Amino acid sequence: MNTRRELPESPYLAAAAGRKPHRVPVWMMRQAGRSLPEYRELRAKNTMMQACFDADLITEITLQPVRRHGVDAAILFSDIVVPLRAAGIDLDIVPDVGPVIAHPIRTAADVATVSPLRRETVAPVATAIGQLTAALGDVALIGFAGAPFTLASYLIEGGPSRNHERTKAMMLGETETWNALMAALTDVTIEFLRVQLDAGVDAIQVFDSWAGTLSLADYRAYVLPHSARVFEALAGYGVPMTHFGVGTAELLGAMSEAVSGHGVPAVVGVDWRTSLTDAAARVRPGCALQGNLDPVVLLAGWPVVERAVRAVVEDGRRAVDAGATGHVFNLGHGVLPATDPAIITDAVALVHQL
């Protein structure tokens, strides 16, 4: 069932689709999170996993930065490993550590234990989306999921990793096992995003947080086909699709291949290490760009923030002149917990003025 809203005034959807927005659209990754006192108050009473599987908490946390900052898009509050939990993986999110997998996936026999995502386990997510689309007015709602490679890294390493050595060793040395795992995780990602799209999200973003650890050749050989299958499977919903990774300057062209060419608006996220103008030259024609203020800038005081925000907006305009179909202002990664919420509010207001 398609319950998609019509949001002709959304600057986010306009920029993503290559239309001229009435103002530069802005939202920030991890805008719903530890930078907000209201979020910290809720989380003091609930674990991360509890929050991610409670419809009312998902709704409230997703709405908090919209109320406070006036951003142009809300991103569904969740965690990258939620679909793994919904597929039966025994895991927890440990404070100050991150996701921890009870039984890491290391062998072909382990891969065979990865089950399809069970829709009923993420019913609270769908319920929350219904509540959010009723509450958000003209503000777009972005659904999200982790890309298969990043999910695979968590499963193989057993948690966050600096070098992803076990992941890359399986990828390079046990390619049949690797491809079986990636195929299973691609199915999980597709199904989790289908749940969100069927419930009414206005756009989706796929996070490949750890893809920057790969060479371009390895990304193309072992990751790109699986990521492309995610976007191809979901293109029929007709919503803008964004592909984002960290440290992916050399991969931007390949990542744009995964997300574009499917007949729907395609957006490529850019981190702060690459200018938007350079990114415009690297991605496929027909892609919009999203980014790319360094999150640390928001800790450096308003004069620094103001200069940097103006610079990103100007770089975005140059990128559009250079061929990008649009620009969505964002950070190059997530809001840091120590960020002053008032600075974020002021930065959003400044973007809207420029």
Curated annotation (Swiss-Prot):
Instruction: Name the major location.
Output: cytoplasm
Keywords carried by this UniProt record: Cytoplasm, Decarboxylase, Lyase, Porphyrin biosynthesis
Q: Name one GO cellular component term.
A: cytosol
For the ligand (substrate), the binding residues are: 30-34, 79, 154, 209, 333
Please, which domain of life does this record's source organism belong to? Bacteria
Q: Which Gene3D superfamilies does its entry note? A: 3.20.20.210
Binding partners and assembly: Homodimer.
Protein family per UniProt: Belongs to the uroporphyrinogen decarboxylase family.
Q: What is this protein called?
A: Uroporphyrinogen decarboxylase
Gene coding for it:
hemE
